Each structure stands twice: as structure tokens, then as C-alpha cells.
Amino acid sequence: MTRRYWNINLEEMMDAGIHFGHGTRKWNPKMAPYISAKRKGIHIINLTRTARFLSEACDLVFDAASRGKQFLIVGTKNKAADSVAQAAIKARCHYVNKKWLGGMLTNWYTTETRLHKFRDLRTEQKTGRLKRLPKRDAAVLKRQISHLQTYLGGIKYMTGLPDIVIIVDQQEEYTALQECITLRIPTICLIDTNCDPDLADISIPANDDAIASIRLILNKLVFAICEGRSSYIRNS
């Protein structure tokens, strides 16, 4: 895999607060190599290590995108939800930003069935068929569409398992991470000082609570994906 320059700037990362970890009492000792100091009761993340792993992740997603691979971005906590949707839409990736439904990947047949139902209902809505139904029946179907849009809207165009999954918060999205591990789907994961760096294929040490931190990391990854997609289009 070719290494590229992704304009990852330490000062920019500091401004985004990427270096602020959790309180020193809430930490995973496995994170010791990624921590540079303690300050006012919190661990400070070593941004040089962050830059290195973020660069590796950008190389990986660029390479995958340049070969037409598909990505899923997962981040369901309120602070991350909007950034996840914006990043995914920009890079034409699938995303989950409301709630991870257990078995979404490991029980793909059920997920696929729900997606087919969702697509059929949306088609009926667009063609005006719902307007011809009795009010009560139409109301039931509209509620179903709304429910499916909330939980499956970000993956409505997904036709198979993703090739790479990007996870914004390891602890919040532990079920999603475990499903990826079970299916051997490569993962890129933001890890704060209370996380286990050994679970993901590429772990990026970073503050997973600050919106600015999440957004910066996602923006770098999305830029690399977009560059890879452009390369794929040029060469196909």
C-alpha cells in the first residue's frame, strides 16, 4: 500500500481538542503507549501517534476506494450523529447514526429483507398509492416508513456487507465492532483513553466526545475516500 501525504497538521488537531482524553481514573492501561501526559486529572493523547494512525487509515481507505470498495460509517451518539451523516453523504458511504440494530451485519438476511420492504414502501409513497388507501392503513404505513427511515435510512442503498467499517466511538458502538470482528470486516476506530486499541484493525487515538475532534478525523478520512473514488472513476 502506497503511503501518501494527507496534510495532517498537529496544530489543527490541538485546536480541535483531539488530544483531550478521559479522566485518569477512567482509562484502559492498554492505552498507555498513546498517552503523553496527565493534566488536571485527564490524560493527554500523544498527537504524533494520532497523526501516524490517521495517515495509515487514510492510506487504507484511499486504496480501498480506488478499487471500488464500499464503506459503512457508524456513530450513533448525539454528538456524532450529524457529523457522521454529513461525512457519509459527502463520500457516498453508507452510515448508521441513530441506533445500531443488533444483527444488522451478522444477520444480513433479515436486514436485507427490511431494506426491500423499506424500498417497496418508499416506491408506493412516491407513486401516490398510499393516498388511495383508507386513512388508517395509510397512517400505519407512513409510521413504518418513518421508523425504517430513522434506523435504515443511511443504509438504504446497501446491497451487501461493507468492505470497511469506520466506527466513531468504540464503547458506544461495541456491538457493531463485535459484528465486524465476527465477520472479519476490517475496521477503523476512534479510540479514547478508556478504549481497547487491540480490537480494531486501525485504531486512531482521539477525543471521541468533542464534535470538532470527530469532525476533523472524519473529514480527513472522507477526503481520502473521495480521492480514491476519483482515481477509481479515472481508471475504470
From Swiss-Prot:
Top-level taxon of origin = Eukaryota
Q: Does the keyword Nucleus apply?
A: no
Q: Which PROSITE patterns does the UniProt entry name for this protein?
A: RIBOSOMAL_S2_2
Q: Name one GO cellular component term.
A: mitochondrial small ribosomal subunit
Q: GO biological process: what's one of them? A: translation
User: Where is this protein chiefly located?
Assistant: plastid
The subcellular localization recorded is: Plastid, Chloroplast
Identify a single GO molecular function assigned to this protein.
structural constituent of ribosome
Keywords for this protein: Chloroplast, Plastid, Ribonucleoprotein, Ribosomal protein
Q: Signal sequence: where? A: none
- Pfam families from the xrefs? Ribosomal_S2
Q: Does the keyword Protein biosynthesis apply?
A: no
Q: Which SUPFAM superfamilies match?
A: Ribosomal protein S2
Similarity remark: Belongs to the universal ribosomal protein uS2 family.
Q: What is this protein called?
A: Small ribosomal subunit protein uS2c
Gene from which this protein is expressed: rps2
